[in-house]
Amino acid sequence: MEAAKKQSVTNQLLAVKSASGKTFSQLAAETGLTNVYVAQLLRRQAQLKPDTVPKLKEALPALTDELIGDMMSPPWRSYDPNLIQEPTIYRLNEAVMHFGESIKEIINEDFGDGIMSAIDFYCSVDKIKGVDGNNRVVVTLDGKYLSHSEQRTENMVSRLNLKGGTSE
């Protein structure tokens, strides 16, 4: 989806949400999705799956079949590079940069040499009260652990296929 069409569809989707008067968290509760995933769907950063269509249409009855069709196509998962200048996004990036090395070391200690997937991944934003009574933001990043593999030629399927003459 080209950038202009993506922006047009996104604007229409966000207008439907705005007209509904519902928050991302309310829509999440109605659809069984996380609030961040609902926001990603409406911003065309995630693909709407067929099983979710009825729940989303029930939560947002003003969604047209054309918009649903757009949401079901694979999204162009890009972002505006100027987005980093938005204060909330800047602070999230700053937090990851500040705590990143420590988080990585703890992942390595607890799991081994690997990474947290951003594909098999869940994210949510929650509001809680701190011990001081002030509102606190909880951002949960829940990703599958993926270990780095030792690159042994005996396990390299493309090499095995080349040697064996098969191309399946």
Swiss-Prot record:
The active site is at R91, E94, S117. GO terms for cellular component: cytosol. InterPro entries: Cyanase, Cyanate_lyase_C, Cyanate_lyase_C_sf, Lambda_DNA-bd_dom_sf. It catalyses: cyanate + hydrogencarbonate + 3 H(+) = NH4(+) + 2 CO2. It holds the Pfam family Cyanate_lyase. CDD domains: Cyanase_C (cd00559). It is an enzyme of class 4 (lyase). Catalyzes the reaction of cyanate with bicarbonate to produce ammonia and carbon dioxide. PANTHER family: CYANATE HYDRATASE (PTHR34186:SF2). This is Cyanate hydratase. It comes from Arabidopsis thaliana (Mouse-ear cress). The lineage of its organism: Eukaryota, Viridiplantae, Streptophyta, Embryophyta, Tracheophyta. The gene is CYN.
